[in-house]
Amino acid sequence: MKEFDKLYLSWRKGKGSRRHIVGVLEHTPNGSFVFTYDNSSVEKAATEGFAPYTEFPDVLKSYNGQVLEIFGQRIIKSARPDVQQFYEFWEIDPAFKEDKFYMLAHTQGLLPTDNFEFLADYNPIIGLHFLTELAGLTNYKLPPDAIKTGDVLRFEIDKENEFDPEAVKVFNSDKEIGYIKKIHCRLFHKPGTELLKLTVKAIDKNGIINKIFIKVSM
C-alpha cells in the first residue's frame, strides 16, 4: 500500500474560515498526474471569493501534462540558505526531497501569498509520519500555557458534528483544543487508527495560541 496517491487542493477565504476542497491532484496507475476541480465545492467557494488556480482557469476541464511541475513551483527552492531548517521542521525524508508529489504532501505547498494548500489522503502504514496544523483554533482562544511542545495528544471521532461527518477532535488530556484538518482526518477513520500517535511539534502564540503543528505517526 502506498502512503498516498491523491492530494486534495484546499482553499479558504482566510484564517478562521472553512476550508473548501476545490480539486484533486491524482497520481494515476500509468504514472501520470491529473488535476481535476470539484465543481460543487468550487461553486460554494466562489460565494466567498474563490478564483481558479491561475494556470488552470477552466474548472470543467481535467488537466494533465505539466500539472505537477506547475504545482511544484510552490515548493521551497533547494538553493535557499534556510532550506535545511525547512526540511528538518517538516521532517522530510532526504530520499524524497526531489519528489514534488511527496514534497507537496508533506509541506502542504503552503505559501504566504495565497490560501491554497495540498492535503494528502494518507493510508495507515507502519512508519507513516507527517505534520498537520490543528484546525478551529480561532474558536478556542487557547491561553499560551494550554499546551507545550512535546505534549502527547489524543483524538476522538466527532460523531455529532453536523457540518463534517469525518470530523476528528483533538484533546490535551481532557481539554479539547482543536480538530484535525479536512482530508487528513480521513486517516483516523481507517483500520489501524489505534496505532496513531499525536505529538505537538511547534506552537505559534502571541497572547493566545495562533497555530499548533502536530506530528501524526504510527
Q: Where are the language model's segments positioned?
A:
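Conserved active-site motif detector
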Residues: 1-218
